[in-house]
Amino acid sequence: MLEKTTRMNYLFDFYQSLLTQKQRSYMSLYYLDDLSLGEIAEEFDVSRQAVYDNIKRTEAMLEEYEDKLVLLQKFQERQRLVAKLKQLISEEEHVNEEMKQVVEAIEKLD
């Protein structure tokens, strides 16, 4: 469950601008603020089932966006490569200063 929550948080960060205001509100309250379906339903004066359906549809949309745009996958790969570069640099005693600057520049991209 934690893995799904983490993935949804990442997907929401990357693709929230593609969602409607209601979808953003529901997802933010559910995943970021950790409100229950009942609490969200009460706040918006709708049924718990309506909130559940909206969140499930939005989750599917976020996964579809990721399938097409692969922003999260690219981000994770960049993170992996930067970590590997850092490890290689730390193992090497005399690393070119310019190489270190390139790694730092890559890190700042995210």
From Swiss-Prot:
User: What Gene3D superfamilies has UniProt attached to this entry?
Assistant: Winged helix-like DNA-binding domain superfamily/Winged helix DNA-binding domain
Cystine crosslinks:
none
Task: Note the Pfam families from the entry.
Answer: UPF0122
Q: Which InterPro entries match?
A: RNA_pol_sigma_r3/r4-like, UPF0122, UPF0122_fam_protein, WH-like_DNA-bd_sf
What job does the chain carry out? Answer: Might take part in the signal recognition particle (SRP) pathway. This is inferred from the conservation of its genetic proximity to ftsY/ffh. May be a regulatory protein.
Give the similarity note.
Belongs to the UPF0122 family.
Q: What is this protein called?
A: UPF0122 protein BALH_3477
